[in-house]
């Protein structure tokens, strides 16, 4: 079906400057989150060369180590989370570059350089974990959130909260 243009709202590159205009202290951390990432996991099934980047099973945006880290000592879990989230940030940035949608990243990076925000990091999350089979039917696994805690954990870790 056609997309209803009235429901789209403003483009991300227009929204972020409005949000940044309301930050003044330079202490805020900005998490740029791609939600509904389960939908993007379906793209490698189509024959489009731009989707190939999503087919790599070793990519951090195709893995979620949140539960595995709970068995680690807090300092090791924090170090692994930091390394993982930095790698994920690089992958999401590359994905935006691949689809020629760097405007939000450029605006956010400039705000960090100017001191309007303390840091910026990219995340990919999915509340459901997998695309439903039909409009009213979940997959066999049901709801299995994917990386939804990452932005929150990043914020907490900056405040010294043990992960």
Predicted regions: what they are:
Residues 5-6, 28, 39-49, 109-163:
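Non-catalytic alpha-helical scaffolds
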Residues 1-116:
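Conserved C-terminal guanine-recognition region of P-loop GTPase G domains, centered on the G4
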């Amino acid at each position: 079906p056609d997309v209803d243009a009235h429901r789209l709202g403003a483009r991300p590159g227009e929204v972020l400057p409005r949000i940044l205009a309301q930050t003044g202290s330079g202490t805020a951390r900005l998490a740029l989150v791609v939600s509904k990432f389960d939908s993007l996991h379906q793209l490698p099934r189509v024959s489009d060369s731009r989707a190939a980047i999503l087919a790599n099973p070793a990519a951090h945006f195709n893995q979620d180590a949140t539960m595995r880290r709970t068995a680690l000592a807090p300092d090791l879990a924090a170090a692994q989370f930091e390394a993982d989230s930095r790698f994920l940030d690089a992958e999401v940035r590359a994905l935006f570059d691949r689809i020629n949608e760097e405007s939000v990243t450029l605006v956010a990076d400039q705000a960090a350089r100017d001191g309007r925000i303390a840091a910026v990091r990219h995340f990919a999350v999915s509340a459901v974990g997998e695309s439903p089979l039909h409009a009213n039917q979940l997959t066999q696994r049901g709801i299995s959130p994917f990386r939804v805690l990452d932005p929150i954990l990043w914020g907490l870790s900056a405040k010294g909260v043990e992960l």
